[in-house]
Design a protein with these regions (language model features):
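Extracytoplasmic/periplasmic solute-binding protein
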Residues: 35, 145, 149-153, 158, ...
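Glycine-centered hinge/linker elements that transmit conformational signals in sensory
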Residues: 185-187, 226-255
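Conserved C-terminal helix/tail region of periplasmic/extracytoplasmic solute-binding proteins
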Residues: 72, 117, 168, 388-447
Length: 447
């Protein structure tokens, strides 16, 4: 999951689409009620969804299957435009500029504020889904200005992924706190197996460093979403901790990692711990990767655990995937109809299964899916959302919070301090200035 690149316009969707006339007469109405599905459209219409490519390709294949099935039932064509994660922001901005090119869009939490006037209110759909499959996890996290401008889709969470055999080798148990992880990490690095936590311009770094910051009781913005709070004694404490953690437990390569490097590091047999979604484990399992010099499969000695607890709390963040419908779409009713189909329990279960558990829903009923309960290496799923906060926590998600994410200000603050390019207080002051500039509207993402 790399970061935004130069954007370009998407082709516009076909115009001239009309809704099927309502069936007349009691026989027609009875037929609709018997089928219990929306009436098909008299003319074939095209629905386009813009989203990022899932790290588990089978998940995208299942979404495509669902779109095609819904399309057959409704005489519609469903097209998915899946782009690299790093291109999604620029592509979606191009769609809004052109007022064409997509009907349904995958969004990050905070996009609802950024594109508030361009998105359809999905409150009726969200409330209906919540009643059937919920309740929603922390529903207020998703409402912007008290409106459902998008429906929560799935979270990509950042648990610890670790090597059980290496931990046993140094005589340590699964770390419960950051200090536990530091103690184990020193021993692991000494035997050639460092910890890999990105401190670079990546999603892994953005989410990982937010969790660490919160676990020490700090934050970069207040509950009002406006007051910049990064410059405080708790931030000094957590930066000082990361300075010794980097020196004693990690290697310099983490300063330039993208979101694939930590996967490769643990699957190559080097890293002992990473903070990552379950894709590293699933890739090792699917590819049959062996521990170098042995016939043992590496996924057999990999496991997951909740993120460490800090002095104040256990905390982590996540990539909050959302789905929105553009107001400029000529197919708003059809888009909402597809989403109702996609959020049926049977379709959601298939979506979860094909992702091998990567797609973690925000709906309580679905988190008990057997794909997690049947595999002890996924036992963290049941509880991780209790400790998961949106990226701008404790404030609401806003357009400004999206920019702070895109500029990687939080991981850059840590990186400047651990490399001694700046002192701890200088790095924090730099972050304070950068975040304040964003919230004042003087600093934006370009390109």
């Amino acid at each position: 999951m790399s970061r935004p690149e130069q954007g370009y316009h998407l082709p516009a969707v076909t115009e001239g689409i009309t809704r099927r006339q309502v069936l007349a007469g009691s026989a027609g109405l009875a037929g609709i009620l018997a089928l219990r599905q929306a009436p098909a459209f008299a003319q074939t219409r095209e629905i386009r969804m813009l989203k990022s490519s899932n790290f588990v390709p089978a998940s995208d294949a299942e979404l495509k299957r669902q779109g095609e099935e819904w399309g057959r039932q409704n005489r519609a064509t469903f097209v998915i435009d899946a782009v690299p994660t790093g291109k999604l922001n620029s592509k979606k901005a191009a769609v809004v500029t052109a007022q064409a090119g997509a009907d349904i869009n995958a969004l990050w939490i905070g996009d609802e504020d950024l594109y508030f006037d361009h998105l359809v209110d999905l409150g009726d759909l969200a409330e209906d889904v919540g009643r059937k499959l919920g309740p929603w996890t922390n529903p207020d996290d998703f409402k912007i200005r008290n409106v459902w401008k998008a429906i929560p889709w799935y979270a990509v969470v950042w648990p610890m992924t670790y090597r059980t055999d290496l931990l046993e080798r140094v005589g340590e148990k699964v770390p419960d706190t950051w200090e536990d992880l530091y103690r184990a990490g020193k021993k692991l690095k000494a035997i050639g197996h460092p910890i890999g936590i990105a401190l670079a311009a990546s999603d892994d770094a953005n989410f990982g460093m937010r969790g660490l910051l919160w676990s020490y009781g700090s934050s970069y913005v207040g509950k009002d979403g406006k007051t910049v709070t990064i410059n405080n004694p708790r931030t000094v404490e957590v930066v000082e901790f990361m300075k010794r953690f980097y020196k004693d437990c990690m290697e310099q390569e983490v300063l330039s990692w993208d979101d694939s490097n930590n996967n490769r590091c643990i699957n190559a047999g080097k890293c002992s711990f990473i903070f990552n979604p379950t894709s590293a484990y699933e890739a090792a399992k699917k590819q049959g990767i062996k521990i170098r010099g042995t016939d043992r499969l590496i996924h057999e000695v990999m496991d997951h655990a909740l993120p460490p607890r800090g002095p104040v709390e256990r905390a982590t963040s996540a990539n909050y995937g959302m789905l929105g419908v553009w107001r400029f779409s000529k197919n708003v009713d059809a888009c909402k109809d597809f989403l109702r189909f996609h959020y049926q329990e049977a379709e959601q279960n298939k979506f979860i299964e094909t992702s091998a558990g990567y797609n973690i829903p925000f709906l309580e009923k679905l988190t008990g899916h057997p794909i997690w309960s049947s595999n002890p290496k996924y036992r963290f799923v049941k509880n991780i959302m209790k400790y998961t906060h949106p990226p701008a926590y404790p404030g609401p998600q806003t357009a400004a919070s999206q920019v702070v994410m895109a500029l990687h200000i939080i991981p850059e603050m840590f990186a400047r301090a651990v490399t001694e390019r700046m002192s701890t207080k200088e790095a924090i002051a730099w972050a304070d200035k950068e975040i304040s500039e964003v919230h004042a509207g003087r600093k934006r993402v370009t390109g």
